[in-house]
């Protein structure tokens, strides 16, 4: 199913009927929303309030009262202000339907319907006139979601400035989504404390969004708070089953497997991951399969079952094996533990020659090389460098 953007317009009535409806909408719309929209347009265009006041032949305080919602803005005033800002206001976009579109995109994100989600986002981006309408803040919330979820290197600072001006007009569900995406942004920056603050704000507005609980369990897993992680995994699984979100359910169960692994329940971790591996093959989910196999290689290492470790490693697609330095590390350790030092050093050399390798892995692999060469002092220096890298 693809969301039909034609439904965001207020209808196809004859022009006189449309004008009447536009007038009614304009009269009934929240003055604060209009004020925030006009202010955010002015801020985005970097236009001083003095210039707006001069063009409208009113005082700056009058413009300020319009922007704060103390005074209502007529359609004529809206048009004049937008004209000064170099845009024209679109009165046809139905904000309620755009709110539904925000929820629809977020649902697709929750369900891992990535292609469908991105297709809808692209349609929104192609209709940039929405950015100067009653649904302006929904438009920028969608752009912000796109920037963070897809990590597309887009500068989201402008989106955030606009959304901070307009968030007071959001529904509770929109606010919950907004703060959840802010939390996700901080998660990508490894700022778990700030991410948790935003997640707490998100759940104040809606405590039943699947991704809110999923993000909680991911953070607590990373922090080592396993009791809390288990609490949110269970809640996430409960919501996923209720919403029939089977794609996301697989990744939730993957988190459960990581929790078993982190609490040294290796048999449970292996059994769950093997069941998920079977499911990933049925669904032809290559990325899920790669995540599961990575876990199984690590489980095999920790259980000292090196034969299984090599078996699972051979099942990993080569494209992932070259880019995932955790897997590269597992492969080196497998050869190291079976005393195949020649191959271990070969893979270390290959990794160190890769320009994309990070400082942590570079130091760690050099440490392993020095250990193989029985150069313990240099190995210790490299390990200390690893810790320094983590601290910085």
Can you name each region flagged by the protein language model?
Residues 1-44:
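A short, Lys/Arg-rich alpha-helix, primarily the initiator
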Residues 45-65:
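Short alpha-helical DNA-recognition segment
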Residues 74-91:
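DNA major-groove recognition helix of helix-turn-helix/homeodomain DNA-binding modules
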Residues 86-103:
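Short C-terminal boundary/hinge segments that cap the last helix of small helical domains
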Residues 121-128, 160-168, 197-205, 234-245, ...:
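Amphipathic alpha-helical segments of tetratricopeptide repeats
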Residues 138, 177, 211, 218, ...:
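Residue register of alpha-helical TPR repeats
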